[in-house]
């Protein structure tokens, strides 16, 4: 009788993030970790979150089984390498929502998600093409994987759209012979598009689009990932009961590929971008 008279506290959803390593050691993972913490603040009365680090293709099956047994309702696998083995677990546990952050093809049992960073890169390219003082712009990338090529192409198209004479010089920062200063000096490059995300342990100002001035980086624009916004929108659909409905009938597999219009991707300009350029 007391159970009917005393209001029951709704069960909180348990949301778990799986990372290949500790988020503070990776700029990419740290951006997702900020998103996880944003969820904690936004839905403190409706869900609880946690993360597990050190998850790869070799142990993801066991990790998934363990956290599902511990009560996980929604699981975000932040690593494309987790996709194949995660699928096996997802088929056996359709009651749990498992998503993979990648451009991998989605499956009826696992949805994938990513962001349209190329939209912000195109705009950053327009800025670079408008302000370059010698028709040269540098683009420093890390790995030629997933959306990276699309980002590079979008940036180059942005440059060309306002300055057809300008050239984009590309360097891969993870190659053995990479020498940042040598690359920039030998090619007389003053404007640089560099890494988009920094880690808590890295106070470098060499990120986003910047101008090299007296050996220092003068930051101009910064493409950003708003993973908190993405996770918030997705969790709202779960809480509203519309998540399952999205995958019914004609649509059997879903990919969430959101960009600037959804608020997942953005471009922040500093005061050093000329007013006329901002109006482009």
Task: Describe the residue ranges of each PLM region.
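A residue-level marker of the well-folded mature domains of exported/periplasmic proteins
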Residues: 2-280
């Amino acid at each position: 009788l007391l159970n009917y008279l005393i209001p029951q506290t709704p069960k909180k959803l348990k949301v778990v993030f799986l990372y290949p390593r500790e988020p503070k050691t990776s700029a990419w993972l740290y951006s997702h970790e900020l998103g996880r913490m944003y969820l904690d603040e936004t839905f403190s009365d409706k869900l609880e979150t946690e993360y597990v680090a050190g998850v790869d293709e070799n142990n993801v099956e066991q990790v998934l089984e363990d956290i599902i047994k511990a009560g996980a309702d929604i699981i975000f696998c932040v690593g494309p390498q987790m996709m194949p083995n995660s699928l096996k677990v997802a088929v056996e546990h359709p009651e749990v929502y498992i998503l993979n952050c990648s451009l991998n093809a989605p499956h009826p049992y696992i949805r994938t998600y990513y962001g349209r960073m190329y939209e912000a890169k195109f705009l950053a390219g327009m800025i670079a093409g408008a302000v370059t003082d010698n028709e040269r712009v540098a683009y420093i990338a890390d790995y030629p994987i997933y959306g990276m090529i699309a980002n590079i192409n979008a940036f180059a198209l942005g440059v060309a759209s306002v300055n057809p004479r300008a050239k984009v010089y590309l360097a891969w920062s993870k190659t053995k012979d990479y020498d940042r200063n040598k690359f920039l000096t030998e090619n007389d490059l003053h404007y640089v598009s560099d890494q988009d995300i920094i880690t808590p342990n890295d106070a470098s100002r060499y990120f986003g689009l910047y101008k090299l001035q007296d050996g220092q980086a003068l930051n101009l624009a910064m493409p950003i990932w708003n993973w908190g916004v993405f996770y918030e929108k997705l969790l709202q659909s779960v809480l509203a009961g519309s998540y399952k409905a999205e995958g019914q009938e004609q649509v059997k597999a879903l990919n969430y590929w959101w960009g600037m219009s959804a608020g997942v991707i953005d471009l922040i300009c500093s005061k050093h971008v000329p007013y006329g350029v901002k109006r482009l």
